[in-house]
Amino acid sequence: MIFGAVLAGGKGTRMGNVDKPKQFLTIGGKPIIVHTVEKFVMNDKFEKVIVLCPEQWISYTKDLFRKYLPDGSRVEVIQGGAVRNETIMNAIRYIEENYGLDEDTIMVTHDAVRPFVTHRIIEENIEKAQQGVICDTVIPATDTIVESRDGAVISAIPDRKFYYQGQTPQSFRAEAFKRLYQELTDEEREILTDAAKVFVMKGEKVTLVQGETFNIKVTYPYDLQLAETLLGGEKKC
């Protein structure tokens, strides 16, 4: 079975003085999280689309989906974790308790604040995961990448052609993630930023899915303005 996991645990502190997490801010008259979940619900390969958010926002999130997603029977809202990968583990526990977990259980994990993910990107993630391949959605780095170990002086300027910017989805077999994550030490878990790094740290091959420059993560106030523009273009297509 294939499950979507929409990660909505962010608090939106970088968005400035807002009264709710950024995933609940609106673009085009609808909350960002609704736009994102709609993209997953449109794909009938998902058994369930699991939305993970802070405990205090669960009821609010359910109300949003009742309002904006009349056919939301495949959407389940549950509590996320303190950090990203703990949130993914919560999704795996939900799957295990309600559907069972085996080596063919696939998860397509995605940021709630990336509402412009395309059908093509989701499909390619699913196809690779069904082949037993771990995958990460990326785009080539277009700016020069500068490394600084102290935040003040350049340590190195690596060759840009070997570097990519990570996006989401990230997709994999849920059982493999659970096993590898449980093997990590506390120190290893502290340096993790996403699911792909769990596999890389354990020596597993992670392949690339070509993302899109417009598959942006809405993080800062400027991103909201850009998202409104992108949404206008999306509606014209």
Where are these regions (language model features)?
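Short beta-strand-to-loop acidic/aromatic patch adjacent to the donor-nucleotide binding site
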Residues: 100-113
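Conserved core of the sugar-phosphate nucleotidyltransferase
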Residues: 103, 116-209
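N-terminal glycine-rich phosphate-binding loop and ensuing alpha1 helix
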Residues: 1-59
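Residue-level signal for inorganic ion chemistry
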Residues: 6, 33, 91, 111, ...
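Hydrophobic helical membrane-anchoring modules
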Residues: 215-237
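Conserved N-terminal catalytic core of the sugar/cofactor nucleotidyltransferase
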Residues: 34-103, 184-187
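Short aromatic/basic micro-patch
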Residues: 26, 116, 171, 217-218
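Residues at the starts of beta-strands that form the adenosine-phosphate
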Residues: 1, 47-49, 74, 133-134, ...
